[in-house]
Amino acid sequence: MAHKKGQGSTRNGRDSHSKRLGIKVGSGEVVRAGSILVRQRGTKWHPAKNVGRGTDDTLFALADGVVAFRKSNKTYISIETGA
């Protein structure tokens, strides 16, 4: 007879890598065109003036300027330019 029991197997032991979602710049920060503002799944934050939305719902700056957040029923992110 064996002196040790068999090890068996488990169905656990795997986990996905974190996706680093969330806000990347705060309100009042100066950004350049093309800068990523938010990484998200779905539209927790919505694009407003001078902000674009990627196919994965990422929000990015379309113009140089200052980031501004506005909340009504939804939270909107816009870029205020100097002009």
UniProtKB/Swiss-Prot annotation:
The keyword Ribonucleoprotein applies. InterPro entries: Ribosomal_bL27. It holds the Pfam family Ribosomal_L27. This is Large ribosomal subunit protein bL27. Keywords: Ribonucleoprotein, Ribosomal protein. The keyword Ribonucleoprotein applies. NCBIfam families: L27.
